[in-house]
Amino acid sequence: FTGEVMNDYTWDISMQWHIADYLTNDCCYLQKPEYTEAAEAFKDTGSFRGQDSLFHPDVVAYYTSSPSVTSHSQFRSLEYTIGGPLKMIPDTDFVAGVQSAEYNYENIYDKQSEVGNVGGSSGNSSANSRDYTALFFESKTSLLDGAGELSVAVRSDDYSDFGKNTSWTVKGLYDVMDGLTLRASVGTGFRAPGLGDLAANTTFSADSHIDYVKCAAQGIARPDCPSEQVNTYIAANPNLGPETSESTNVGAIYT
């Protein structure tokens, strides 16, 4: 929805609502308890369920698994902006607004994967939600009879799961002559941690890596250093805060 106020100002109200549901199915993973049962039976008696091979299709079907993940996510937001001339400062336009949003998700793994019975797979069930409110303002001022331009922007976010953060940017342009423009900017930024990083259950994965330090200690040359699997556990950290950054850019545009 859009409109005008006092002929000089425009306003805009926008809404979003996204829902995503999907199911992921995999095939032919090793079901560890059933495989152990079959392997021990062959070791003791030489057969299992009337078959004389651990790799008979009927036996393989017994100890293989088809893990699945059921996922749901929902995002809703409402944003209101207003813009026009900032009359207290000559030759300046502005845009200001407020945004409110809510996001939630869940990834549900099958029960056998959750308890660690599926070999070679990684992942575990997780669910989380957050909401936030943001206030933002941006202005652009024409300077030096149009030869220069100054932009200022500031945004303040208030997240339900890790608190508040404010970021800002100041940019400037100056046309030195026809075809040559100098520009510079300085600012800060941030990125909120992912919901899975904050709340996912601990996940097991058998990752491959090359340990060059170990090979050097054993006198093995780097090209001959073998790859090996290690047990890896990936856990969430509910105490994560936002990633923050500072940036400065200076440059020229020549055409």
Where are the language model's segments positioned?
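Surface-exposed, low-complexity loop segments enriched in small/polar and acidic residues
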Residues: 2-132, 187-242
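Outer-membrane beta-barrel channels and translocator barrels
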Residues: 6-8, 87-89, 144-146, 177-179, ...
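Generic beta-strand/beta-sheet core signal
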Residues: 14-16, 97-99, 153-155, 173-175, ...
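Membrane translocator/pore-forming domains, dominated by Gram-negative outer-membrane beta-barrels
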Residues: 102, 131, 136, 140, ...
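Solvent-exposed loop/turn segments connecting transmembrane beta-strands
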Residues: 129, 157-166, 244-246
